[in-house]
UniProtKB/Swiss-Prot annotation:
Positions annotated as active site in the UniProt record: H22
Pathway listed: Carbohydrate metabolism; L-rhamnose metabolism
Protein's name according to its UniProt entry: L-rhamnose mutarotase
A Gene Ontology term for the protein's cellular component: cytoplasm
Organism name: Listeria innocua serovar 6a (strain ATCC BAA-680 / CLIP 11262)
Entry-linked HAMAP family: L_rham_rotase
Length: 104
């Protein structure tokens, strides 16, 4: 498993809505994540800056990245775009993080 981490950014005032939408994550989106090899997926919020930290373990990063091509993922991005910084294609603005320490 490969560990993948990134940060994303909420627009101010959207912390509760972001959590609500993830509490109600569409079953089709859950299935797509699992089908693309995602496991142990967590998202944390730094409340003072509206910064999100996402961590996911993937079987194969290339396969995981293909989720972006799915209709359900693109629909999810469009649904989330009004509450977080997004790219022109509605994908979240995300900064990939480099792992600098790991303790098994």
């Amino acid at each position: 498993m490969e560990r993948v981490a990134s940060i994303m950014y909420l627009y101010p005032g959207n912390q509760e809505e972001y959590k609500k939408r993830h509490d109600e994550l569409w079953p089709e989106m859950k299935e797509a994540l699992k089908a693309h090899g995602a496991a142990n997926y967590s998202i944390f919020l730094e409340e003072k800056t509206d910064t999100l930290f996402a961590y996911v373990e993937v079987e194969d990063k290339a396969i995981y990245d293909k989720i972006a091509e799915t209709e359900i993922c693109q629909k999810w991005w469009k649904y989330m775009a009004p509450i977080m910084k997004s790219n022109p294609n509605n994908s979240p603005v995300a900064v990939d993080l480099k792992e600098v320490f790991y303790l098994a």
